[in-house]
Every structure is written in structure tokens, then in C-alpha cells.
Swiss-Prot record:
The keyword Nucleotidyltransferase does not apply. Allosterically activated by fructose 1,6-bisphosphate (FBP). It binds two fructose 1,6-bisphosphate (FBP) molecules per tetramer. Substrate binds at Q79, R85, N117, P118, V119, D120, D145, T146, A147, R148, T227. Changing R150Q: The strong stimulatory effect of fructose 1,6-bisphosphate (FBP) is abolished. It is found in: Cytoplasm. Changing E155K: Increases the thermal stability of the enzyme. In the absence of fructose 1,6-bisphosphate (FBP), the Q4(R) mutant exhibits a 4-fold increased Vmax value and a 5-fold increase of the affinity for pyruvate. The modification Phosphotyrosine is found at Y218. InterPro entries: L-lactate/malate_DH, L-lactate_DH, L-lactate_DH_AS, Lactate/malate_DH_C, Lactate/malate_DH_N, Lactate_DH/Glyco_Ohase_4_C, NAD(P)-bd_dom_sf. This is L-lactate dehydrogenase. The active site is at H172 (proton acceptor).
Length: 310
């Protein structure tokens, strides 16, 4: 099965590398305005496949996306140190106005998987530009934030992160909502499990974990300029869910008719992901404080998209 990636920068190339190592696709096509960059990444990643899986990785044009089941949209400008994801909006919306029509001309049946930041607003932009059913335009959303939340909880509790079920909702960014109230470990409510484990979560512990999740991207960008390994692996996992019709639940961003009274906004909620993209949304139980925080997050994203006319 073929997967396309538009944008061969750090996120696009990391995604291609993760796809190859995990053996998610049989063919990966990298498309970029800088053909030499795309070719260099494709050749380098191809040389890793003898140590992993038989995946054909190559550079191509938009026409080479024909037949792709999923296309990752990673084109855009990089986030600068200290710059919020929403400040990227104007620059990256202009890029998508050129990219989305060309992708759909070549691969009209593909699920569009948006990775460009600010990802929630860019998901809304891609949805409006594409005129596709809303489920076929999926943003990477808070999958990485959710993974960070689970990893930090697991570290505190000294359990495997795979046993932790906790979500980050709303914006992939400053207004994101860590859902503590419905978090579980091995099917046991989080606070109850923590007490039984002898690893109670004090207010200071919760503040430290919240800070660790919320500020992770800023710390990484300050240290090395960009984040790409984590999101590359996350995107590869979403592609696998689409190609295998997995119907797993992921906190991805998609157009949502209404959330907490805010209409027509793209943001992250737990969603069922399969061959057609988003096939359903699971609205979790939230505390009153979490509901209010989610409403505020939705309003921030709604205002940003509205300012662009989307």
C-alpha cells in the first residue's frame, strides 16, 4: 500500500523513517519543492530498509501520489524558538492553499493526515479547502501530548505507559486540557491506583506532570530547534490505523460540529480511526473544570480559524 508525504523537512522525513522501520507501508513517496532534499532523504531511508522491512522509499512529484491510501501533509515553515503554534498560522495557511488541491487531484480517495502546525487550525484549513467529508481530514492533534501525559504518569507510578489510559484534549498547544478526572491505570481510577501503589499524586506532582506535558515542545525546540522523532512515530502509528482499518481510539484532531457550545471547530477528542479516517468520536467524562477548559480551548481555535476565513 502506498503512502504519500508532502514536505520532506524534519517531520516529513522522520515520518518516512518511522514508516520504513515499522513496515507500515509497501511504498512511501516523498514530495517536496526541494527535490534534492526529498531525494536525499528517500535514498538515506531506503538504505535503512535492509535492517527493517521491505519498503520502497522514493522521491516523486504530486502525480506520483496516485493511488495513495493516506497522504501526510507536513509542508510548511518551522516553528521558531518561543513562537506559539498559533503564530505560525498565517504562513502555513498560504502553503496549504497550494498543496491541498494538488494532492487531491492526484489522490482523490486518500485520507489527509495533517501534521503542519498549528495542527488544529491547519486541519480546519485543509478540511475547508478540500471539501472532503470531515472524517477524511485528520490532524495529528494531541497524540503526542497524550503520549507524554501517559509516559510521565507511568514514570511516577512505576508502571508501563501502555497500562495508563489518560487523554489530552483540545488544542495541540498552550490551551490543551489534561484530563485527570477519568484517567485510569489497568482499569483502576488513577488516584485510587496511585494510593494503592504508594505513589500518591500530590498537587506538586500534578503540577510537575502538567508542566512536563505542556512545555515539552518548547524545551525541545529551545535545545535542538524542532520536534520530529516523537511526532514522526505518532504519525506512522496513525497511518497504520488507517491502512489496517484498525478502529483504534486516538486523540486526533478533526472538524467537530459542536463541542461545549462552540460550533464548527477542529480540535482533538478521542476518535475511532479506520480506513475511512475518523469513523466516530468518543466524548469522555469530564469534570466541570475540564469542560470549561475544553470550551476555552475550542474558542481559541475557533477564533484563529475565523480570522482566516475558515
Amino acid at each position: 500500500m502506498k503512502v504519500g508525504i508532502v514536505g520532506s523537512g524534519m517531520v516529513g522525513s522522520a515520518t518516512a523513517y518511522a514508516l520504513a522501520l515499522l513496515g507500515v507501508a509497501r511504498e512511501v513517496v516523498l514530495v517536496d519543492l526541494d527535490r534534492k532534499l526529498a531525494q536525499a532523504h528517500a535514498e538515506d531511508i531506503l538504505h535503512a530498509t535492509p535492517f527493517a522491512h521491505p519498503v520502497w522509499v522514493r522521491a516523486g512529484s504530486y502525480g506520483d501520489l496516485e493511488g495513495a491510501r493516506a497522504v501526510v501533509l507536513a509542508a510548511g515553515v518551522a516553528q521558531r524558538p518561543g513562537e506559539t503554534r498559533l503564530q505560525l498560522l498565517d504562513r502555513n495557511a498560504q502553503v496549504f492553499a497550494q498543496v491541498v488541491p494538488r494532492v487531491l487531484e492526484a489522490a482523490p480517495e486518500a485520507v489527509l493526515l495533517v501534521a503542519t502546525n498549528p495542527v488544529d487550525v491547519m486541519t480546519q484549513v485543509a478540511y475547508r479547502l478540500s471539501a472532503l467529508p470531515p472524517g477524511r481530514v485528520v490532524g495529528s492533534g494531541t497524540i503526542l501530548d497524550t503520549a507524554r501525559f501517559r509516559a510521565l504518569l507511568a514514570e511516577h507510578l512505576r508502571v508501563a505507559p501502555q497500562s495508563v489510559h489518560a487523554y489530552v484534549l483540545g488544542e495541540h498547544g498552550d490551551s490543551e486540557v489534561l484530563v485527570w478526572s477519568s484517567a485510569q491505570v489497568g482499569g483502576v481510577p488513577l488516584l485510587e491506583f496511585a494510593e494503592a501503589r504508594g505513589r500518591a499524586l500530590s498537587p506538586e506532582d500534578r503540577a510537575r506532570i502538567d508542566e512536563g506535558v505542556r512545555r515539552a515542545a518548547y524545551r525541545i525546540i529551545e535545545g535542538k530547534g524542532a520536534t520530529y522523532y516523537g511526532i514522526g512515530a505518532g504519525l506512522a502509528r496513525l497511518v497504520r490505523a488507517i491502512l489496517t482499518d484498525e478502529k483504534g481510539v486516538y486523540t486526533v484532531s478533526a472538524f467537530t460540529p459542536e463541542v461545549e457550545g462552540v460550533l464548527e471547530v477542529s480540535l482533538s477528542l478521542p476518535r475511532i480511526l479506520g480506513a475511512g479516517g475518523v469513523e466516530g468520536t468518543v466524548y469522555p467524562s469530564l469534570s466541570p473544570e475540564e469542560r470549561e477548559a475544553l470550551r476555552r480551548s475550542a474558542e481559541i481555535l475557533k477564533e484563529a480559524a475565523f480570522a482566516l476565513g475558515f
